[in-house]
């Protein structure tokens, strides 16, 4: 009897093959590159004797409209979680250069950059159907495994809230549902004695606690997150990802992320990540 069905989808080069191997290590029966038109026929047969199944569905699988239709059918019939793997363009380009593989949409008259852009446009509908988006740009295989384990175990546990601090100067994360920009508060980087510290340190916390508007904005973030969690749970979703951004990802964003972690940690499973803390 099928209890766990995972659909891995996303951009070419974003790590679906690596993720599929990790799911296989976790006990999933894995199928890659299955034509989308036969999935509806095969699933009822497979689901009789398999508890955990992972499918890769991507641009090789068939027409985008057919893929959307199949995913919608699976969501109506099975306990499916759709995981969309994403990555920044420059990362995808480097990965294709490193592996020397061709992008599935690459043609003689098309550059790799244009092929990636075309695939992004094609996958907008699938991205909207996805339950979880994972940005693999900065993840090694071990970190990707940790993300997958957290995502899949959250199905059996209470709601999962992921809080990510980051610096805008290093790029906007692709796998968050909300982004709160805290750059309008004074930057501790320019305060004597605080430059080398982070938002985890007492001195930085005291500085920001005493900054006008910080507490009020923190309360506003909590109200938005509370509202989103309630609506996500009503729709059967199990994870909300919140990004907190400042300039360098060292002080203000870390402080706000730490405060949110303390506030929510007792009521739901909270994962705290500081992407750019050195």
Swiss-Prot record:
Q: Which Gene3D superfamilies match?
A: P-loop containing nucleotide triphosphate hydrolases (3.40.50.300)
The entry's GTP-binding residues are 58-61
Q: Per its UniProt record, what Pfam families does this chain match? A: PapZ_C, RapZ-like_N
SUPFAM superfamilies cross-referenced by the UniProt entry: P-loop containing nucleoside triphosphate hydrolases
MF terms per GO, please?
Answer: ATP binding; GTP binding
Residues given in the record as ATP binding sites: 10-17
Keywords assigned by UniProt, alphabetized = ATP-binding, GTP-binding, Nucleotide-binding
Among InterPro entries, the record links this protein to: P-loop_NTPase, RapZ-like, RapZ-like_N, RapZ_C
The task this protein performs is described as: Displays ATPase and GTPase activities.
Query: Member of which family?
Result: Belongs to the RapZ-like family.
Name assigned to this protein: Nucleotide-binding protein Tmel_1373
């Amino acid at each position: 009897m099928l209890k766990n069905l995972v659909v891995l989808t996303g951009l070419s080069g974003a790590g679906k093959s690596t993720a599929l191997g990790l799911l296989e290590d976790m006990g999933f029966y894995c199928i890659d590159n299955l034509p989308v038109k036969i999935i509806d026929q095969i699933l009822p047969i497979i689901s009789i004797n398999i508890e955990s199944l992972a499918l890769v569905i991507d641009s090789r699988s068939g027409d985008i409209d057919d893929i959307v239709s199949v995913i919608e059918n699976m969501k109506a019939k099975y306990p499916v979680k759709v995981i969309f793997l994403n990555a920044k363009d420059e990362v995808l380009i480097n990965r294709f250069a490193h592996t020397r593989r061709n992008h599935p949409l690459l043609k003689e008259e098309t550059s790799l950059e244009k092929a990636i852009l075309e695939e992004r446009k094609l996958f907008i509908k699938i991205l909207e159907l996805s339950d979880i988006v994972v940005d693999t740009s900065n993840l090694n295989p071990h970190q990707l495994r940790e993300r997958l384990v957290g995502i899949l175990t959250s199905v059996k546990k209470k709601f999962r809230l992921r809080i990510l601090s980051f610096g805008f100067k290093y790029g906007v994360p692709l796998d968050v549902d909300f982004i709160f920009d805290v750059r309008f508060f004074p930057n501790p980087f320019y305060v004597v004695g605080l430059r080398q510290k982070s938002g985890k340190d007492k001195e930085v916390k005291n500085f920001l606690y005493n900054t006008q508007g910080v507490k009020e904005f923190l309360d506003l973030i909590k109200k938005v997150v509370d509202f989103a969690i309630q609506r996500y749970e009503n729709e059967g979703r199990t994870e909300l990802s919140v990004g907190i951004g400042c300039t360098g990802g060292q002080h203000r964003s870390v402080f706000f992320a730490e405060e949110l972690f303390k506030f929510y940690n007792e009521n739901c499973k909270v994962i705290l990540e500081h992407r750019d803390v050195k």
